Amino acid sequence: MLTLSPAVRIYLATGATDLRRSIDGLSALVRDRFSLDPLSGHLFLFRNRRGDRLKILAWDRSGFWVLYKRLEQGTFAWPPEPPGAPVEMSNADLLLLLSGVEIAQTRRRRWYERVA
């Protein structure tokens, strides 16, 4: 399970990405296509054409991480936006995506905390 700071932003690359790319190729993609800094400490998610594989690029002050997930059945529920600027998502949405839940189908309920 991933535990992320609330300050970490999560960017999802729309469209398909050639997942033969590794750290250098994915960080160049973040820098050139999205005009974002791969050394920012934020997470960048990429999906292959079939939709059954996912890579997450992250920087943690001492080096890059690449997390890779391959589904044995099914596909990741990816937003239908055309390739272009990345879509920002919340930590909760990332956990839902990795669990196989289609984010567009979920309905959020409001939660209130008692202040006093």
Segments the model singles out, each with a brief description of its role:
Residues 1-116:
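Polybasic/polar functional segments that serve as interface/processing modules
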